[in-house]
Amino acid sequence: MKILVVDDSEAFRRVMTELLLRAGYREVTEAGGFDEALEAYSRDHPEIVFVDMVLPGRSGVDLTKEIMSADPKAKIIAMSSVINKAMIRQSLEAGAKDFLLKPTNELALSSVLTLWSG
């Protein structure tokens, strides 16, 4: 399964990639921002995309809308270290399938992947 991790924090992307590799996912791509993420999505067609909702420039909500308009079947999991009802609502309204609190752990990541990988 191809997975794309979008986050402006290189350290967080490395942690996510390591967790995914340890869980057996071998095709993990990383992107640090909006444009890089769109390019990676178009090129790799990942089955699941983890998107930080707070990105520099255009937001993760904007990215989610953009991906969903190009591919309505996309499976996007919103992520943020800031949890509030408005952000969760905006993420889900934009098309995200789920919301994951950062930093995450193997159990939470595994649960989300099991739920949305089918």
Ranges and model annotations:
Residues 30-48:
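Acidic, metal-coordinating helix/loop segments flanking the phosphotransfer/catalytic sites
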Residues 56, 84:
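The feature encodes the CheY-like receiver
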Residues 10-29:
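Two-component/phosphorelay signaling modules centered on CheY-like receiver
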Residues 52:
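Active-site residues of response regulator receiver
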Residues 86, 104-113:
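C-terminal output helix
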Residues 33, 59-62:
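Acidic catalytic/metal-coordinating carboxylates
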